[in-house]
Structures are given as structure tokens and as C-alpha cells.
Amino acid sequence: MNLKPESYILRIGHRPERDQRVTTHVGLSSRALGASGMYLAADDAKVADSITDVATRFGGTFFCENNVKWKSCINQFKKSGGKVVHLTMYGLRLQDVIADIRKEEKVMIVVGAEKVPGDLYELADYNVAVANQPHSEISALALCLDHLYEGKELDLAFPDAELEVLPTKIGKTTIKHEHDQEKP
């Protein structure tokens, strides 16, 4: 299933000394809920490697690019025809703008950690709020992706998974897949 529009996440303001867990969860939530990849505007190879490892083990084509320059990343994305959605509690209500965002070909969803630079508000095509209240950036991202894809992301398949989780009423059931590896 190919979800439209394509979505990419830009994580800005990540502080390696204190944000590893939250940023990792931003990446994992993005992957599970249909985003194609994440750009990390900080140098934290450990976080990027952790997200990439999960994507490899659980399938799909999600990527995590480490140490991007956030403003250049946004400008290149916009130059390629993409639109930028900045999640902020000060933006327009998600429910009022999501129909317009769905019409775009591809979107970059910007998720901040600390106070974001003021010029981000100007660079964004959409400044979007989930509830216009302070809360978790992970919950804002999850709700944004769910509204963007109208629940279709919950039925995604993740090809080439090494490990697959099966829905079960009680307990835990997984399948370990053996993939043929090409030898050099």
C-alpha cells in the first residue's frame, strides 16, 4: 500500500545528551505510521542507527539520515516540490487544514525538541497545531500522521521483515523470517 502524500519527518532541536529516547520514538512512530523517512538535524549516530536497525529488522524502506542542516534540508525539499508542515501548538488547527495537506504530493513534517528558530514559522507552508495545547511531540506527530492517512497507515505491510509481530489476543507471537542473502 502506497500512502499519499509521501511524508518525511525533520527532527530539529535534538539534544544528544537528553533527547535520545524521545527522538528515537519520533523515528519509530514515524515509520510505523507511514512516513518514508526521517532527517535528524543533529549529530547523533546512535539514535539514527537505532532507528535504522528497527527498520531493517521489522521491514520496510524507512531511512534515517543523520546530521542534516535543517534549513538546507527544508529548502531542498521545497525546491523539489514538497510542502513543509511545522507542528507547533501555535499553528492552525489540524482538523481545519488537514484536507488541504492531503492534496499535496509530498510533505515534510517538522518536529521540534527545544524552542524552534523563529524563521521556521516563515519557511513552513503550514504551521499546524494538535489541540493548541502543550503536549508531547510524539503524540502530535502520531495524530498528524493518522489524520493525514485517515487510518490507512494502520494496515501497512512492511516487506522484507526479519521479524514479524502477529496480532494475538493473549501473549506474544512473532515470526522470524529467513531471507536469502546474496553472496558476493
Swiss-Prot record:
Transmembrane segments: none annotated. S-adenosyl-L-methionine binds at L87, G112, A113, E114, K115, V116, V130, A131, N132, Q133, P134, H135, S136, E137. It comes from the Archaea. It catalyses: cytidine(56) in tRNA + S-adenosyl-L-methionine = 2'-O-methylcytidine(56) in tRNA + S-adenosyl-L-homocysteine + H(+). GO terms for biological process: tRNA nucleoside ribose methylation. Its EC number is 2.1.1.206. It is found in: Cytoplasm. Keywords: Cytoplasm, Methyltransferase, S-adenosyl-L-methionine, Transferase, tRNA processing. Pfam families: Trm56 (PF01994). GO terms for cellular component: cytoplasm. GO terms for molecular function: tRNA (cytidine(56)-2'-O)-methyltransferase activity. Belongs to the aTrm56 family. Homodimer. Specifically catalyzes the AdoMet-dependent 2'-O-ribose methylation of cytidine at position 56 in tRNAs. This is tRNA (cytidine(56)-2'-O)-methyltransferase.
